[in-house]
């Protein structure tokens, strides 16, 4: 296929998805020719030959590289800017989204998600590189992902980033100002990035899809204002308010304290999507009667972390009950279990990771109790993955991990292969951090070429289960169960 046919097909897709009108075609072609370093044209077939936008993207990037248009280390930015030629303006996308929303929220999100994939805002090919498997436990089937989707920056890109003058615009990666931002240095390319403007409880928010999605239709609801994360009644109201608009999705929030929170605490945001997480599938271990909220059902979830599940048809009462749990947890201590609400200087240590969904016609809130205390033995966190597990997971246990989906570092993609070689007594370059774990595995089982891969994956799953247990404040033991009931009694006073 000629380069001009590739360009024409690219333009035809832009016509089809509403980026341009027929009267814009010549203008769009000439802008694209200049962008690719071309100044000529040959008439081609108007019938589309290639309908895959990512294949066309590759073909046009190859043309640009041949013409030396892309500066060293600028591939990421140029690629996003190229796909911007195929991405409708924000006003067009918002208009079409809310028009489709009149038919159903499902129609609207399906339109936006499919478009985000077509224009490479959601990087489907990178996401497909992730290694994913599951591990069965007494709590249900945990999901494990080794995150290979985010490409490592090459040395040229790193060198180029150092030369870029520092900028405070946009203030962070979640600000609305990222929409259409070309990018520079360590600020990601967002030329083809689009955001849906949405009102939740009278406040302005943006709804977007995550470029490197961790689960199906992984999306982010971000505050129009750059302000810190905070878990409070307003947060519960926002989660439930989002469900009123998008009942087809679940939504949750990272905790708002270091160690137990996510990687971005400086910008108020929540994460949503269409995925039935392992924790959502978990049954109740026991039911609880709430003395002050008779319209709200409650129970303790059979889960390695400490989770309360509240449900009600009455959204107002449900939010009040969740807020009551939060306020009581923020002042509750049980030093026999190393649970301490505040330091002597008043520093708070207790918060909640909340998750909301609609199930069987009721609003449902899962409240995961979090404690970010540290001590001499566990300087990274008492209720954080303990050192023996750091060879697999040492990062914060955020919202997604809490719900039973492990996001493990890319290094494990190669490191675990070396562990497998070690277990088979083959020449290997196994990292020393895995030595004790691998020795333990070797002593427990005989490995063959046919069994080693699945067995190592199972062992990784066992580590993730232990990670979640470490993060649980009331352990799944008799002592932990009794401690949990004491807290419930405190709430019911």
Swiss-Prot record:
Its EC number is 2.7.7.12. GO terms for molecular function: UDP-glucose:hexose-1-phosphate uridylyltransferase activity. It is an enzyme of class 2 (transferase). It is found in: Cytoplasm. Pfam families: GalP_UDP_tr_C, GalP_UDP_transf. Keywords: Carbohydrate metabolism, Cytoplasm, Galactose metabolism, Nucleotidyltransferase, Transferase. PROSITE patterns: GAL_P_UDP_TRANSF_II (PS01163). GO terms for biological process: galactose metabolic process. InterPro entries: GalP_uridyl_Trfase_II, GalP_uridyl_Trfase_II_CS, GalP_Utransf_C, GalP_Utransf_N. The keyword Nucleotidyltransferase applies. One of its GO terms (cellular component) is cytoplasm. Disulfide bonds: none annotated. It comes from the Bacteria. It catalyses: alpha-D-galactose 1-phosphate + UDP-alpha-D-glucose = alpha-D-glucose 1-phosphate + UDP-alpha-D-galactose. Pathway: Carbohydrate metabolism; galactose metabolism. HAMAP family: GalP_UDP_trans. Belongs to the galactose-1-phosphate uridylyltransferase type 2 family. This is Galactose-1-phosphate uridylyltransferase.
């Amino acid at each position: 296929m000629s380069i001009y046919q590739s360009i024409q097909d690219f333009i035809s897709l832009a016509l089809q998805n509403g980026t341009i009108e027929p009267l814009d075609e010549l203008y769009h072609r000439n802008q694209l020719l200049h962008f690719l370093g071309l100044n000529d044209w040959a008439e081609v077939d108007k019938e589309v030959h290639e309908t895959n936008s990512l294949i066309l993207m590759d073909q046009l990037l190859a043309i640009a590289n041949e013409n030396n248009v892309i500066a060293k280390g600028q591939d990421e930015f140029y690629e996003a800017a190229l796909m911007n030629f195929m991405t409708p303006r924000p006003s067009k996308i918002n208009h079409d989204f809310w028009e489709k929303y009149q038919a159903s929220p499902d129609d609207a999100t399906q339109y936006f998600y499919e478009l985000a994939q077509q224009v490479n805002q959601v990087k489907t090919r990178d996401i497909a590189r992730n290694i994913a498997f599951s591990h069965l436990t007494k709590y249900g089937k945990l999901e494990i992902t080794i995150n290979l989707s985010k490409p490592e920056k090459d040395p040229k890109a790193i060198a180029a980033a150092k030369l870029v003058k520092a900028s405070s615009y946009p203030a962070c990666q979640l600000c609305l100002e990222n929409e259409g931002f070309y990018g520079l240095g360590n600020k990601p390319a967002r030329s083809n990035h689009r955001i849906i403007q949405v009102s939740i409880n009278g406040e302005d928010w943006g709804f977007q899809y995550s470029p490197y999605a961790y689960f199906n239709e992984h999306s982010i609801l971000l505050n129009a204002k750059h302000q810190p994360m905070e878990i409070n009644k307003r947060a519960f109201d926002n989660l439930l308010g989002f469900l009123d608009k998008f009942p087809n999705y679940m939504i949750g929030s990272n905790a708002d304290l270091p160690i137990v929170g996510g990687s971005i605490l400086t910008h108020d945001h929540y994460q949503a999507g269409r995925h039935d997480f392992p924790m959502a599938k978990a049954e109740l271990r026991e039911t609880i009667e709430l003395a002050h909220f008779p319209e709200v059902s409650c129970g303790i979830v059979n889960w390695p972390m400490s989770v309360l599940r509240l449900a009600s048809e009455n959204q107002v009462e449900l939010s009040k009950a969740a807020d009551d749990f939060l306020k009581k947890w923020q002042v509750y201590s049980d030093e026999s279990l190393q649970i301490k609400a505040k330091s002597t200087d008043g520093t708070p240590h207790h918060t909640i990771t909340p998750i909301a969904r609609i199930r069987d016609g009721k609003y449902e809130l899962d409240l995961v109790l979090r404690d970010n205390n540290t001590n001499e033995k566990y300087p990274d966190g008492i209720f954080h993955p303990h050192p023996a597990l750091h060879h697999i997971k040492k990062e914060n246990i955020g919202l997604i991990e809490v719900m039973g989906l492990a996001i493990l570092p890319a290094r494990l993609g190669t490191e675990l292969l070396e562990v497998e070689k070690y277990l088979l007594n083959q020449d290997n370059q196994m990292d020393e951090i895995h030595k004790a774990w691998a020795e333990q595995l070797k002593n427990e089982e005989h490995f063959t070429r046919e069994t080693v891969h699945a067995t190592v994956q199972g062992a990784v799953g066992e580590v993730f289960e232990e990670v979640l247990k470490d993060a649980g404040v009331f352990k799944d033991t008799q002592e932990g169960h009794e401690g949990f009931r004491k807290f419930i009694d405190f709430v019911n006073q």
